Each structure stands twice: as C-alpha cells, then as structure tokens.
C-alpha cells in the first residue's frame, strides 16, 4: 500500500486546531487504523486471491466466485473508509489555514505606510483568529465548519459500518458455495486464514465504533455548549450594546424621546390681569383672557367643605347683577347686627381656584342663597374702593355689608 506520511502530516496540522476529543479521535485514527492497517492487515490479506481455491477445473469459475465472495477487498475498503472519514477534517484544516493566511495579509497591510492619495476606506477589523495563547479560536464561521466536520465524519462512519455488514458480514466462514456462471454446478470454494481475518474484521469494526462514539461525544461537547455560546454572543441585536451602537444622538426621530428622559415643559404665557376699575363696570370681559381667581370659601359656611363657591353667570352679566346683590345685602343687614363676624378670608386675589368663577364689580362681597334657609356661599375680593354713589345713606349701608370682613350672618337671608 502507498505511503501514509503525507496524509499523516496534514492530519497532524489539523490536530493542533482541534478540541480535546478531536485530538483523541485523530490519535485513534493514526494508531489503531493507519498503523495497524499498514503493518498487519496487508500481510494477512496478501494471499487473499491466490489462496482462494475452488473444487472445479472450469476456466474462469474460480475468478467469478472470488468476485462474488469479495466485491472489494477488506484492505481497500478500509483504506477508502480512512480517506472518506479524514476528508472533513482536511476541509476544516483548509479553512483554518485560510483564516490564518488572511490575518497575516491584514497585518502586512497594516505595517505598510498609508497611501497619500485617495479617500480613507472605512472597514471594520475582524476578530483576531488566535487567542492570547496563540491558538486558533474556534468561533463563528470556523465553529460552524468544525461542527459540520464532525457531522460528516459521523455519517461516513455509520455508512461504512453498514456497508461492511451488507458486503461481507462480520465473520468469514471457511467454506463458500458458488453457483455462478460459468461454473457447471454449485462448487465449493475455500478461504485462507478465515479466523485471523475475522479477528481483524472485528478489530477494525471496534475501532470504527470507538471513532463514532468520540464523534457523538464531541457533538455533545461542542454542539450543545460552544454552539449555544456562539448563538448567544454579545453581538446579537437585542443586547444593550447593540442598541447603544445603533442609536445615534442626532439620527433618531425628532418625535421620539429617550426612555428615561422627562417630558418637555411647555410654557404658555398670558398678558397680566388688571382689576376692573369703576369705569369698566358693566362691561364684558374680553374673550381669551383668564378670569381673576376666586378666594377660598369661608371655613364656617354650610355646604360642601373645601369647595370654592361660584356665582352663576357670564362676565357680561356682572353689571346687571350688581343692583340685585346690593338689595339682598340691605335686606340682610338687620339680621347681621346680632351675630359675630366670622374670621376674614386671607386668600390673596392671585390664589388659584378651580372651576369657572364670577365676581361682583367694584370689589363688593356677594352672597346668594334660597329664601328657605339653604346655605349660601360667600366670595370675597379685595380691590380699590369704588367711587362714592349718589346716595350717601345707602352707600354707608352698602359699605358695611361689603367690607373686607365677611360675617357669618351674611349667609342667612
């Protein structure tokens, strides 16, 4: 048989870039297959055809019976098995050498001085092929090549074991009966050293089973651990690093905000509000301007606690309601003398209050209520004193009822 040194050197280079189980597999291939096949098996099967004899004198009968008994020699069958099983490993070795050569070329280009002319080409440097210890790291495309290498080796092992069983079986019998043409009848043929050949057949079958078991273990070790680790690498799209790299500060949509940022503050300005003067009594407030805030309700008033009262009506009806309110205040004046005044409301005019609010012109305090004793709500607003009316008697009474202090007696009419 030919020289195995060339194939041995190639497989030795591949052993440097394999896992621990892969190195054990290559050791089994070297010692228990190539070495045993080259040293002993060829000597055992050397007289295979010359010592195959049949009890007939018919020319050609012995040759056709040998061809039917052994379609292919065991030695040549095992040589083909070694070549086919080693081919995926050689392909993986070629991939490794290609990556190493590409890295060497890249380093040579980096060492060269940069060209003065031409725009600078932006390219992403690939990950280094070798790790810190100088070994080729099995990751990425190289990892996939290694996994396919193991899978094809396993398939070839299974195929050759099944082929050997269907071609010869796993045992050689000393007697082989042949009735193939041109034999005149069924003839008996005898095989030389059948027991020794059977031992070698079983030995090579055991080595093939060990190699198959190592391939399965390597698939478990590499396919379920390293391949899973490669699939969950930190460069996947849903990791924080990839999202941070893809998000640009000025490239996003202007309508989208970062997840942790506060909503933008929107400032809406209104013109300053001025208290209505005496000359503007009876005029409707301009649309679009905010209404003046209403002071809080007195704490002692019956009704809903804490809710500021409102006097119905729009801003345009303030002048029409002022005389009616003054009359109500004059009628309630006899009842107010027997009661004590409640504490004044200290809410400034600018204090905010919810809901629509209405005010009496001229800064008068207004009260509204039903005649059957229901509680009324009093609103107080502090403004500059209005001009004195024509009747001084009535104005003095009105000034008493519309003073800065609101009394509890004003609530009952």
Swiss-Prot record:
Primary localization class, coarse: membrane
InterPro entries per the UniProt record, alphabetical: Connexin, Connexin46, Connexin_C, Connexin_CCC, Connexin_CS, Connexin_N, Connexin_N_sf
Keywords for this protein: Cell junction, Cell membrane, Disulfide bond, Gap junction, Membrane, Phosphoprotein, Transmembrane, Transmembrane helix
Membrane-crossing residue ranges in chain numbering: 20-40, 72-92, 150-170, 199-219
Signal peptide: none
Low complexity: compositionally biased ranges: 352-376, 393-406
Function according to Swiss-Prot or TrEMBL: Structural component of lens fiber gap junctions. Gap junctions are dodecameric channels that connect the cytoplasm of adjoining cells. They are formed by the docking of two hexameric hemichannels, one from each cell membrane. Small molecules and ions diffuse from one cell to a neighboring cell via the central pore.
Protein name per its UniProtKB record: Gap junction alpha-3 protein
Organism, scientific name: Ovis aries (Sheep)
Gene name tied to this protein: GJA3
């Amino acid at each position: 048989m030919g020289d195995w040194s060339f194939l041995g050197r190639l497989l030795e280079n591949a052993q440097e870039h394999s896992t621990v189980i892969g190195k054990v597999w290559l050791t089994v291939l070297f010692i228990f297959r190539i070495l045993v096949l080259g040293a002993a098996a060829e000597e055992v099967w050397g007289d295979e055809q010359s010592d195959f004899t049949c009890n007939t004198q018919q020319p050609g009968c012995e040759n056709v019976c040998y061809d039917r008994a052994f379609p292919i020699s065991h030695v040549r069958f095992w040589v083909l098995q070694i070549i086919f099983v080693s081919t995926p490993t050689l392909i993986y070795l070629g991939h490794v050498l290609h990556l190493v050569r590409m890295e060497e070329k890249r380093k040579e280009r980096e060492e060269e001085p940069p060209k003065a002319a031409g725009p600078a080409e932006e390219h992403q440097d690939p990950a280094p092929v070798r790790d810190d210890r100088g070994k080729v790291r099995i990751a990425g495309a190289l990892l996939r090549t290694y996994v396919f290498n193991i899978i094809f080796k396993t398939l070839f092992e299974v195929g050759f074991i099944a082929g050997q069983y269907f071609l010869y079986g796993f045992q050689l019998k000393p007697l082989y009966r042949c009735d193939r043409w041109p034999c005149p009848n069924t003839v008996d043929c005898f095989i030389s050293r059948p027991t020794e050949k059977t031992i070698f057949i079983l030995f090579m079958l055991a080595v093939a089973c060990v190699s198959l078991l190592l391939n399965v273990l390597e698939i478990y070790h590499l396919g379920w651990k390293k391949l899973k680790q490669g699939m969950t690498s930190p460069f996947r799209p849903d990791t924080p690093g990839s999202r941070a790299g893809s998000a640009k500060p000025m490239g996003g949509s202007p309508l989208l905000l970062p997840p942790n940022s506060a909503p933008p503050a929107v400032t809406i300005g209104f013109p300053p509000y001025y208290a209505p003067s005496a000359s503007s009594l009876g005029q409707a407030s301009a649309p679009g301007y905010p209404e003046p805030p209403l002071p809080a309700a007195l704490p002692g008033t019956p009704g809903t606690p804490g809710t500021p009262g409102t006097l119905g009506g729009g801003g345009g009806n303030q002048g029409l309601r002022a005389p009616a309110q003054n009359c109500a205040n004059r009628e309630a004046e006899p009842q107010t003398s027997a009661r004590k005044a409640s504490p004044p409301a200290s809410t400034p005019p600018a204090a905010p209050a919810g809901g629509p609010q209405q005010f009496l012109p001229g800064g008068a305090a207004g009260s509204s209520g039903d005649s059957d004793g229901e509680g009324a709500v009093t609103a107080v607003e502090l403004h500059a004193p209005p001009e004195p009316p024509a009747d001084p008697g009535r104005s003095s009474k009105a000034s008493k009822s519309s003073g800065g202090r609101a009394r509890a007696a004003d609530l009952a009419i």
